[in-house]
C-alpha cells in the first residue's frame, strides 16, 4: 500500500494564532502543481485522507482535492506541527490493517511530516519537506516498514 505525506502549501507569516495562518497564492499554486504531478503518476484515488485542523492544511486539501477522489476525509487533531509521530504511525498502521487501504494521504506540517516519514521508513533520517512537498512511501503493514517510492517538490 502507499502512504502519501504532504506538507501544506506556503502560508502567511502572521495571524491571530499559528493554527489560523492561511495559504498564500503561491502556496495554493505550488500545492496544485504537486497534486497534478501526483495524479499524472497514476495516483488520483485515496481510500482515506487525514488532514490537520490548521487552516493552511485544510486549505491545501481543499485546493488539491480537485485532482483526487477521496473515499473518506478526516480532520485529525493528532497531525498538527508537534504531533507525536509514533502515535500517528500506529494509528495509520491500524487503519491500514483494519480497512485494507491501498492509498492514504496525510496533509500536515513540519516537523511532523519529516518524523512521520522516518517512522514508516526504517533507518531514514527525518527529511526536510519544502512547503507543498509530497513523498510516497510503499508501505508493508505486515513488515511495519516501507521504502520511498517517489518525492514531488513544487
Give the ranges of each region predicted by the language model:
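A broadly conserved amphipathic alpha-helix scaffold signal in soluble, globular proteins
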Residues: 93, 114-121, 135
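A glycine-rich beta-strand to alpha-helix segment
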Residues: 101-117
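A short, acidic, amphipathic alpha-helical segment used as a generic capping/interface helix at domain edges
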Residues: 87-96
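Glycine-rich phosphate-binding loop signature in dinucleotide/nucleotide-binding domains
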Residues: 41-44, 95-102
Amino acid at each position: 500500500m502507499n502512504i502519501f505525506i504532504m506538507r501544506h502549501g506556503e502560508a502567511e507569516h502572521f495571524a491571530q494564532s499559528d493554527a489560523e495562518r492561511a495559504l498564500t497564492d503561491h502556496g495554493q499554486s505550488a500545492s496544485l502543481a504537486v497534486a497534478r504531478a501526483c495524479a499524472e503518476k497514476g495516483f488520483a484515488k485515496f481510500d482515506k485522507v487525514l488532514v490537520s485542523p490548521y487552516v493552511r492544511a485544510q486549505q491545501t486539501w481543499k485546493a488539491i482535492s480537485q485532482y483526487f477522489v477521496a473515499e473518506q476525509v478526516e480532520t485529525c487533531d493528532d497531525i498538527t506541527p508537534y504531533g507525536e509521530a509514533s502515535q500517528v504511525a500506529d494509528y495509520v498502521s491500524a487503519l491500514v490493517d483494519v480497512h485494507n487501504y491501498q492509498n492514504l494521504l496525510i496533509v500536515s506540517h513540519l516537523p511532523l511530516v519529516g518524523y512521520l516519514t522516518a517512522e514508516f521508513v526504517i533507518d531514514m533520517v527525518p527529511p526536510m519537506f519544502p512547503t507543498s512537498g509530497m513523498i510516497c512511501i510503499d508501505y508493508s503493514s505486515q513488515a511495519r516498514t516501507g521504502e520511498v517510492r517517489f518525492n514531488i517538490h513544487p
